[in-house]
Amino acid sequence: QEFSDLLLAKRGEGVEVNLIYDSFGSLATPREFFQRLKDGGVNVLEFNPVDPIQAGRRWSINHRDHRKLLLIDGRVAILGSINLYDNSSSGSQAPPRTRAGRLEPAPGWRETNIMIEGPAVAGFQQLFLDTWTRQKGPALNRGSGYFPVLGPRGHDIVLALGSNADSRDHLIYITLVSAIKSAEAYVHLTNAY
């Protein structure tokens, strides 16, 4: 509720708000949640609808969008593992909840997210727009605000890589292996699967 309220408030201020959600991953989310956003002027796109008739001939239950990506004004990208539901957004130190009259510990999950600023944000912006286009989302106002000119930030090298069900090049895997092979002091890796 708090998240949708914030999106609607920003939309009310004239901010363009576009949301892609995975159909299968959001089965437990009430349809009213997305309808309320649509009614408030948010552009909402269902990724690969679970209904094969609605999805069309290329439907596959395993063709999912697992990205968690927040883009702000083409200048900031926040990405990682957090989802928009209680277990994920509550954190691992969440207070107990009451269920069926009993006090139970909240099953919070450990999540990792990063914030990126600088030219690499354009790569993440392009990944979002490519997905929007492939999923046949409504036309967006693709003004210059999507890709502002950004100067370098920091000293790290950041590259936006994406994959989808049609990818056959294993670019993410190849890049991870290459990065690990080039390590000289340490490797830190977090991956859920």
Briefly describe each language-model feature range.
Residues 1-193:
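Charged, low-complexity intrinsically disordered terminal segments
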